[in-house]
Amino acid sequence: MKRLYNCLMIGTVALTIVGCDLDMMPETTMTDAAFWKTENDLRGACNRFYQQMTGELGGFSHDYRSDELRGNSANSISDGSWTVPSTSGNWTNPYWRIFISNNILEKAERANVTDAIRNKYLAEARFFRAFHFFELVKKYGDIPMIMKAVDDTKDPALSMPRTPREQVIQQCYDDLDFAAEWLPDIDHVDTWGHVSRSAALAMLVRIGLYEGTYIKYHKLQGGDYKFHLKRAIDAADIMMHIDKKHKLYPDFQALFTYDGEGRQNQENVFVRVFGPNEAPVNTNNQTHGNSREMENTVTVTRNMVDLFLYTDGLPRDKSPLKLSHETCFNDVFENRDPRLAMTIYEKGEEAYKGAYTPFSFRNGYNLKKGFILKDWASLYAEAVDKMVIRYAEVLISYAESLYEYNGYITDQQLDETVNELRRRVKMPAMLTNAFVKEHGLDMLEEIRRERTVEFIDENKRYDDIIRWKIAEKVLPACLLGARLSTNDVEGGKVDELKKRITLNGGMFNGKKVCDEDSIYVLETAEDRRFDARKDYLYPIPLQEITLSGNNVTQNVGWY
């Protein structure tokens, strides 16, 4: 961690630095004596949060750690082959941002501004500190909670031991409560993409639900899961019933394109802003290669496709609308939740290089959600903004938190959460208590299902299976791809593909992996594992243990 300070201006904010070599101390053209005096100085200091975003706040990323997506090769976290790293940006990058926050929080007191102005920028710094502390807790559990600016690589703070996660999460709540009080409403944010009161409240929802369910299902000693769930419920209740600043965008498909950008889309809660729409790709515009990666790398697993309901509101193991046998690729879309056809490509749709042909790019289901054909065809890069938090997350998190807290949810609460998401896509069947009882469903499972299908490829699935403590069940299972039909695949590729498909009612290599023939097997269960004793937390990078003087201890089971 000490190497991070080679990237921080000792005694300054380093506003002139866009990037840095972690092994070099950058020169400074700005001293503390000349800074921290005006509102413009505070604004410039906080702008750094938006100039150098990483992790979930960075560009578009496709999370291959779970059973949701598969890339060109196996993911070491998903298949259980990961080992203890020497160093890792998963640790250092969040801490870097936390140290920037702490620097601002200490030195903003020098500025000759009103308390209201100062508190606005303190709130911004505290939002990002909470965001990154939570990012660390999700991965590592207990972490060193460093709450001061460090201007010396020998500062004792860099050797502090791990702080209990409960204490770190409480600090996140304190920071976000302050942020929610002092940040402007989203309607009055000066610069679009900067954090608002809504973003702070939504983070309270996210953290409260995560920590509450993590404590509940992992049975953490000393943790009060209901306390955290109540934090989520209360914050969501404010957003939904008091502030009322947000609503769902009417078009799910367009939500992830340029049409869904900006203030006019009230589903946007916190976005990572890139360049102007259809911006040329050059050094003056920030772009990303999301659509290009979707063509070259990303495939949605059959494991996820099977979770989509049929239009009667029933899952595939209960619905009479399920076809007895799929005869072609597009049969999987028959009578399904409309979001399925908005998430993956159907055969014949205009896609990467003309009409989409199954198995021509990947051996799973090719991701359609968020793909922008025009940018891919002309630029191989795009500038569409990334939604870090959207209002749909608040709605479904409210439903889940209510059920986990109370053990039940009312039809009215379902109607303003789960059923709002369904109405947006014109899903015929609504979720009610009577429907669940009549068909022998599990309400919690249906709420979780709704979250999963709504947020395919939005970096939710891995965190969800970790907090629900079902990773030990879903990650060691086969990863399945698309159904192979000789009518859908060109030429001689069929014989090669047939070596990896299920036969005789879902058998592969002598084991039953699903209930259908001709399903492509992306990864076998024999090639996947999950050790519940250790894999629910990341291993601490070895260098961080050494740099702390062994005060930071390794997570259980990692060596």
Task: For each feature predicted by the language model, list its residue ranges.
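An aromatic- and glycine-enriched ligand-binding surface/loop that stacks and positions planar moieties
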Residues: C20-S76, I143, M147, D177-F178, ...
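Flexible, polar/acidic helix-loop-strand segments at domain edges
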Residues: E326-Y391, W558
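Acidic, serine/threonine/proline-rich low-complexity intrinsically disordered regions
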Residues: A149-V150, R162, Y214-I233, D385, ...
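Conserved, well-structured interaction surfaces
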Residues: E39-T54, A74-Y140, P156-Q170, D174-W192, ...
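Bacterial Sec-dependent N-terminal signal peptides
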Residues: M1-E27
